[in-house]
Amino acid sequence: MSPEVALNRISPMLSPFISSVVRNGKVGLDATNCLRITDLKSGCTSLTPGPNCDRFKLHIPYAGETLKWDIIFNAQYPELPPDFIFGEDAEFLPDPSALQNLASWNPSNPECLLLVVKELVQQYHQFQCSRLRESSRLMFEYQTLLEEPQYGENMEIYAGKKNNWTGEFSARFLLKLPVDFSNIPTYLLKDVNEDPGEDVALLSVSFEDTEATQVYPKLYLSPRIEHALGGSSALHIPAFPGGGCLIDYVPQVCHLLTNKVQYVIQGYHKRREYIAAFLSHFGTGVVEYDAEGFTKLTLLLMWKDFCFLVHIDLPLFFPRDQPTLTFQSVYHFTNSGQLYSQAQKNYPYSPRWDGNEMAKRAKAYFKTFVPQFQEAAFANGKL
């Protein structure tokens, strides 16, 4: 159900509270998922004119789970705070004295419900952490992370239900990784969606038993960061080592991700240097180039009255990854009607060269390769 459809069914006096939740409500570490509501119902009599829904189920993303809490207002007394039912978490009993925004409920503040939900989620986190006491190993993992503020202050924990047969229970740690994405080139962060939310990397680590014999890590990147780093398949994190600890494993993943970000940033500046060198060396031979991301360059060159194009595609992780050179005849066509071309990656190249050296080496390579390309174009293409 879309937020607009849901709000149209809510009692008008309660609508500001719910609007703040579904339109602006982001609670916890997962900034890519908003709060949402379902199961709208009314406690009013059938004679009450609509819209009159005053109770609903609130879906809250937390530690890779979705909490489903029932929130019950009274449309006849909209100035009163709501009641809460915590669904499957019957053991979760919040401390009323710690719910400041519920105790001092202010119906003139449209964010009062959202503020109460945030306080409840904080208490729910403490409730889940306390459940780890049933396992000394999981408690050790939690306490060692807690001692490091960069991890302990950005962590959610969900302790699963105890297995009736084995007495074991699973637990999931969700951590917001302290990786700086602020220097990623802005062109890589475009065109994902209108409201991408916070740029964030979350590491989920699931312990399927209390002795950590089955541990499954997974990395989640917000849409813009995933796009900027080359897609979901571009980053593979290591398996959790047997006998390993989170306090050792999490920094490894942070280091891996930080290096990936640095590769992207370095690639952007190196591509810009590369294209600047080609502009200097080839001058009027430059037909066009990508002036934003510096990922493409096209040259129009001549060798003994034979004109040809060279399309240069620079990869995301340049200079580590070698550019592709595509030679294209301006005279000859393939059977499908396309200009005859050949792509080359087997040419002199070193990622240690600066842009000027790469341009000089490319110019020398063009002179040696063009004669055989011209011959192939005449042999395989049509005028």
Swiss-Prot record:
Expressed in all cell lines examined. Highly expressed in placenta. Residues 30-147 are annotated as: UEV-like 1. The modification Phosphoserine is found at S2. Keywords: Acetylation, Apoptosis, Cell cycle, Cell division, Chromatin regulator, Cytoplasm, DNA damage, DNA repair, Mitosis, Nucleus, Phosphoprotein, Repeat, Ubl conjugation pathway. It comes from the Eukaryota. One of its GO terms (molecular function) is tumor necrosis factor receptor binding. Induction: Down-regulated by DNA-damaging agents in fibroblasts, by retinoic acid in brain glioma U-251MG and promyelocytic HL-60 cell lines, and by bacterial lipopolysaccharides (LPS) in peripheral blood mononuclear cells (PBMC). Component of the ARISC complex, at least composed of UIMC1/RAP80, ABRAXAS1, BRCC3/BRCC36, BABAM2 and BABAM1/NBA1. Component of the BRCA1-A complex, at least composed of BRCA1, BARD1, UIMC1/RAP80, ABRAXAS1, BRCC3/BRCC36, BABAM2 and BABAM1/NBA1. In the BRCA1-A complex, interacts directly with ABRAXAS1, BRCC3/BRCC36 and BABAM1/NBA1. Binds polyubiquitin. Component of the BRISC complex, at least composed of ABRAXAS2, BRCC3/BRCC36, BABAM2 and BABAM1/NBA1. Identified in a complex with SHMT2 and the other subunits of the BRISC complex. Component of the BRCA1-A complex, a complex that specifically recognizes 'Lys-63'-linked ubiquitinated histones H2A and H2AX at DNA lesions sites, leading to target the BRCA1-BARD1 heterodimer to sites of DNA damage at double-strand breaks (DSBs). The BRCA1-A complex also possesses deubiquitinase activity that specifically removes 'Lys-63'-linked ubiquitin on histones H2A and H2AX. Belongs to the BABAM2 family. This is BRISC and BRCA1-A complex member 2. It comes from Homo sapiens. The lineage of its organism: Eukaryota, Metazoa, Chordata, Craniata, Vertebrata.
